């Protein structure tokens, strides 16, 4: 009886510990997004960032971004004083002794301008009738011009408004009634004009030495689909597929021919691409290590996960500080410091493997799997210490793909897979253009004019 009670107590304690672990998960110690955090629970201050020593707010020397007076305003209005504030005398003939300038930045009334193209037909003496040619792009009796269609794309794809709200915005801002069907048709035509751009983006990413990869869920036609992102600092390719794994990655067409260093999280299908080297995301590892620390004995003086996390942070700081000074490779002093932190990392995760080897509870099994991964794939986690072109984390990919979640929050799911792929194609175009210093509206006008922007070949 006593033995059975002890076994039952151990089982219940393990269940309680697992439930506490699940309740303790948040965006700081797992892969859960910040939107899943409870709005009613103020999180404890457990930021993975270390103190910088600087005060909050703008730093000394920061240029600021306030409005400034312009030298040549569009209009000048003079406001003369009527009478003297001192004696009440008229000031019409008084000398001018100064002018205070105040400028108001505003928009003029906006209205749509309609241009009619008249195609004149003339009959020659020979009897043949010849008609004038319409300008390129003028193909219907009535149609919207490139700037209006660019605004539709800007609101719908660039700012994530729904079709209904996009149509309402056009009607209210510009007095132009637009149907939801028009928004869909404009998006379809725009995406169809991006085939060459998408081929170029995929090729440039596949040829790069370092590229980031990530994926996130998107509701399409009421079902979960997956958006895949391949990116560099200059190019972005976003695709949508029903599968999260290798089928979806193959559909994007980058990893199948990629020979550089792929930066990604520990999602197993990435490891099937053996022609590439791999840099596993240290930011993900830090969140997992934080989860181990959160469930550790609060009375313990030392935790293997905390030491491993501190070593990763220290290595990253050593490299970023050196790069900030213009260095491209470690000198002897930096290499010694890196080697020391690598020893700290290795010994910590080795102890983690040993401490959790019993795997008697679900928590211990999870922590053991993490420690084994950090140890077995140490080279892939620390590749950034050997080649400073490689980022330690996959934050760039997460930033490029984050807009999918933002779009879903603002306007909900997409109705069809075709529509989702059109959205992803245009977002690839906009993200890449931004990385080249171009503005959304500028490149959208080029796209709707039938001459989509392409990145320079050099």
Residue ranges and their predicted role:
Residues 3, 117-123, 128-458:
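Catalytic center-proximal scaffold of phosphoryl-transfer enzymes
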């Amino acid at each position: 009886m006593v033995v059975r009670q002890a076994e039952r107590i151990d089982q219940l304690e393990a269940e309680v510990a697992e439930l506490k672990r699940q309740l303790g998960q948040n965006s700081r110690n797992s892969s859960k997004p910040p939107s899943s955090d409870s709005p009613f629970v103020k999180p404890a201050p457990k930021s993975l960032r270390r103190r910088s020593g600087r005060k909050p707010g703008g730093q000394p020397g920061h240029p600021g971004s306030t409005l400034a007076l312009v030298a040549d305003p569009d209009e000048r209005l003079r406001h003369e004083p009527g009478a003297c504030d001192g004696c009440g005398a008229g000031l019409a003939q008084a000398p001018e002794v100064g002018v205070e300038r105040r400028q108001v930045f505003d928009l003029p009334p906006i209205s749509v301008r309609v241009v009619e193209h008249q195609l004149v037909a003339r009959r020659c003496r020979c009897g043949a009738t010849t008609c004038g040619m319409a300008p390129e792009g003028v193909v219907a009796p009535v149609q919207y011009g490139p700037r209006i269609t660019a605004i539709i794309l800007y609101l719908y794809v660039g700012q994530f408004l729904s079709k209904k709200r996009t149509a309402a915005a056009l009607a209210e801002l510009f007095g132009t009634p637009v149907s939801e069907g028009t928004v869909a048709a404009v998006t379809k035509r725009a995406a169809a004009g991006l085939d060459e751009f998408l081929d170029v983006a995929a090729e440039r990413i596949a040829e790069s030495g370092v590229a980031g990869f990530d994926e996130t869920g998107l509701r399409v036609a009421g079902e979960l689909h997956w958006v895949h992102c391949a990116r560099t600092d200059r190019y972005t390719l976003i695709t949508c597929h029903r599968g999260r794994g290798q089928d979806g990655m193959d559909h994007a067409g980058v990893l199948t021919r990629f020979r550089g260093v792929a930066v990604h999280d520990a999602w197993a299908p990435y490891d099937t691409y053996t022609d590439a080297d791999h840099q596993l995301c240290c930011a993900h590892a830090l969140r997992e290590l934080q989860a181990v620390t959160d469930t550790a004995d609060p009375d313990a003086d030392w935790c293997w996960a905390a030491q491993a996390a501190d070593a990763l942070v220290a290595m990253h700081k050593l490299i970023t500080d050196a790069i900030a000074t213009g260095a491209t490779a470690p000198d002897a002093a930096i290499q010694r410091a890196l080697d020391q932190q690598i020893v700290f990392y290795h010994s910590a995760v080795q102890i983690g493997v040993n401490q959790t080897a019993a795997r008697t509870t679900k928590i211990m099994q999870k922590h053991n799997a993490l420690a084994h991964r950090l140890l077995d794939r140490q080279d892939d986690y620390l590749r950034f210490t050997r080649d400073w072109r490689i980022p330690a984390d996959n934050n760039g990919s997460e930033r490029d793909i984050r807009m999918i979640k933002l779009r879903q929050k603002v306007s909900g799911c997409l109705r069809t897979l075709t529509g989702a792929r059109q959205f992803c194609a245009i977002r690839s175009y906009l993200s890449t253009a931004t990385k080249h210093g171009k503005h959304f509206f500028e490149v959208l006008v080029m796209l709707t004019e039938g001459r989509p922007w392409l990145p320079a070949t050099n």
